[in-house]
Amino acid sequence: MITIALPKGALLSDSIELFKRIGLDFSSFLDSKNRQLQIIDPTNTAQGLLVRATDVPVYVEYGQAQLGIVGYDLLLEKSPDVAHLADLNFGGCRMSVAVPKTSPYQTPAELPPNGKVASKFVNCAKTYFQQLDLPVEIIPLYGSVELGPITGMSEAIVDLVSTGRTLKENGLVEVETLFHSTARLIAHPLSYRLNLDNLNDLSEQIKNSVSKS
């Protein structure tokens, strides 16, 4: 039986809808009364695991799940050893540099050498500023990153932005987009190569469904 890692949070509803279109029903995960983290589809074809978004690539890399859905942002941040199968065309957002609207720094390149940048995406932020050849200190924050500049702990942040509303409400503005992110279908490399449990057929059904939507 194929095991699929599904992400809690913003991507869950669209992920479940995608699988429903190919005949797999994990909609119980959307029930507010549900406490199960593992659900077998009524057809007994596959089972779903409900995990934190950051853990999806871990379950897939280690083979506890053969398929998973995860944001492109996490694939760049974590660089897991997984097979990248498809862009699922939902969950669109962007990784951006933002500063206070009153900041004297209106582009990332204007930030002072050894300035401070708060982010939960430490590797993405490091890579970006290394490419700029600008030495900065990346401060890892895993809660409300916007508080970095508000409290004076950092001059800027690197974070995911969807509508930009949270930034605006906290007096921040985007000054650069690092990349755009959408949900991606990933697979355990060996399972995919060996086509265990007809994994390739299922992944093709998913790709076909995405192309038709």
From Swiss-Prot:
Give the intrachain disulfide bonds. none
Q: What class of enzyme is it?
A: transferase
Q: Give any Gene Ontology cellular component.
A: cytoplasm
Keyword Lipid biosynthesis found: no
Q: Which GO terms describe its molecular function?
A: ATP binding; ATP phosphoribosyltransferase activity
**What EC number is given for this enzyme?**
2.4.2.17
Query: Does Kinase show up as a keyword for this record?
Result: no
Q: In which pathway does it act?
A: Amino-acid biosynthesis; L-histidine biosynthesis; L-histidine from 5-phospho-alpha-D-ribose 1-diphosphate: step 1/9
**Keywords of the record:** Amino-acid biosynthesis, ATP-binding, Cytoplasm, Glycosyltransferase, Histidine biosynthesis, Nucleotide-binding, Transferase
Pfam families the UniProt entry points to? HisG
Any one Gene Ontology biological process term? Answer: L-histidine biosynthetic process
Instruction: Tell where it localizes.
Output: Cytoplasm
What reaction is this protein's catalytic activity?
1-(5-phospho-beta-D-ribosyl)-ATP + diphosphate = 5-phospho-alpha-D-ribose 1-diphosphate + ATP
The family assignment reads: Belongs to the ATP phosphoribosyltransferase family. Short subfamily.
- What job does this protein perform? Catalyzes the condensation of ATP and 5-phosphoribose 1-diphosphate to form N'-(5'-phosphoribosyl)-ATP (PR-ATP). Has a crucial role in the pathway because the rate of histidine biosynthesis seems to be controlled primarily by regulation of HisG enzymatic activity.
- Domain comment (free text): Lacks the C-terminal regulatory region which is replaced by HisZ.
Under HAMAP family, the record lists: HisG_Short
Question: How would you summarize the oligomeric state and partners of this protein?
Answer: Heteromultimer composed of HisG and HisZ subunits.
Q: What is this protein called?
A: ATP phosphoribosyltransferase
- Which species is this UniProt entry from? Crocosphaera subtropica (strain ATCC 51142 / BH68) (Cyanothece sp. (strain ATCC 51142))
Gene designation per UniProt: hisG
